[in-house]
């Protein structure tokens, strides 16, 4: 067996996750530089070009220092889901290992993490008729009605979804209608397919009030860095609200609130407050997911460069023992 083949078979993959604004990206980058690894981004929005500030993408300097995957690989209007990511990421990890490099997965998109750790079945393609009927139900009865139905049919999966993410809600019910099986059940059937890669998951944790402070501060920093201009450029490309509603990426927190500002629905101050509120809500759902679905080793989220260095060294020590 070649050294590359031995590496592919033997090297586990460090997975760093945690709620938004917990410092995952900085820790993963520091670790990757230290062990000469490549980073697989498990962020469902960083894959899209043109959404840089609002998704907290790695800087150009960081991208030059470490090889990153699933950053700026898709156009915003392209459809890309967790099932696609799971298959692509597993293939990409194997390719990284074949080169003799280590891979680090970093991100907090719960469906992406779920797919890697627990698997996804080969989900059916979209059915235009079923989707149209569900969309009509959504338009007439609202998201609450569809979410209530999903909660009845697949409560475990429903708990992982944000009811306001209507495209995911419609897709979940579409899958159940087509297959006659729950999304939870389909994922369970897929779990064994992932046995070729062993993940060592770590999660970053911090007190809830401190996390919320970080979220508020980061939102202000994004606005100061040009998020309003970035959102305006997207708004001008996808002018109508109806057009934006058909593109899942444009439902991203940080953009949709500013689109509403451009539509005259909110003041700018209120839009920023909503970004902070919705991001806090998202972090809360992430924490619920991590608690209920993941078996991870928790680390204190670093608050400064000294703590970041200490966490990096701790991960290197733990990884060297695998």
Swiss-Prot record:
Necessary cofactors: Mg(2+)
Residues binding ATP: 18-25
Domain of life per record: Bacteria
Assigned EC number: 2.5.1.75
Enzyme class: transferase
The UniProt record lists the keyword Glycoprotein: no
Region named Interaction with substrate tRNA: 43-46, 167-171
Site positions (Interaction with substrate tRNA): 109, 131
Subunit annotation: Monomer.
Family, per entry: Belongs to the IPP transferase family.
Function per UniProt: Catalyzes the transfer of a dimethylallyl group onto the adenine at position 37 in tRNAs that read codons beginning with uridine, leading to the formation of N6-(dimethylallyl)adenosine (i(6)A).
Protein name, as recorded: tRNA dimethylallyltransferase
Gene source species: Chlorobium phaeobacteroides (strain BS1)
């Amino acid at each position: 067996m070649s050294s590359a083949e031995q590496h592919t078979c033997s090297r586990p993959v460090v997975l760093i996750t945690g709620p938004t604004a917990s410092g995952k990206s900085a820790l993963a980058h520091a670790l990757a530089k230290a062990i000469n690894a490549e980073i697989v981004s498990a962020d469902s929005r960083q894959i899209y070009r043109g959404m840089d500030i609002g998704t907290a993408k790695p800087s150009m300097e960081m991208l030059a220092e470490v090889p990153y995957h699933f950053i700026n690989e898709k156009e915003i209007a392209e459809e890309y889901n967790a099932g696609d990511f799971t298959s692509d990421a597993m293939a990409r990890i194997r390719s990284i290992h074949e080169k003799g490099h280590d891979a680090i997965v970093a991100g907090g998109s719960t469906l992406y993490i779920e797919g890697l750790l627990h698997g996804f079945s080969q989900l059916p393609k979209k059915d235009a008729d079923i989707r149209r009927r569900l969309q009509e139900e959504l338009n007439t009865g609202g998201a609450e009605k569809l979410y209530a139905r999903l909660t009845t049919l697949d409560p475990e999966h429903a708990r992982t979804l944000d009811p306001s993410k209507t495209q995911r809600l419609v897709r979940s019910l579409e899958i159940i209608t087509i297959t006659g099986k729950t999304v939870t059940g389909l994922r369970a059937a897929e779990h064994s397919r992932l046995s070729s890669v062993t993940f060592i998951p770590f999660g970053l944790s911090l007190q809830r009030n401190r996390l919320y402070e970080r979220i508020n501060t980061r939102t202000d920093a994004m606005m100061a860095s040009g998020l309003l201009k970035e959102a305006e450029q997207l708004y001008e490309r996808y002018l109508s609200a109806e057009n934006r509603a058909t593109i899942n990426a444009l439902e991203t927190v940080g953009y949709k609130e500013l689109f509403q500002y451009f539509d005259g629905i909110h003041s700018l101050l209120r839009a920023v407050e909503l970004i902070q509120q919705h991001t806090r809500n998202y972090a809360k759902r992430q924490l619920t997911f991590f608690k209920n679905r993941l078996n991870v080793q928790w680390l204190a989220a670093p608050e400064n460069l000294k703590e970041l260095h200490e966490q990096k060294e701790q991960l290197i020590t733990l990884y060297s023992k695998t």
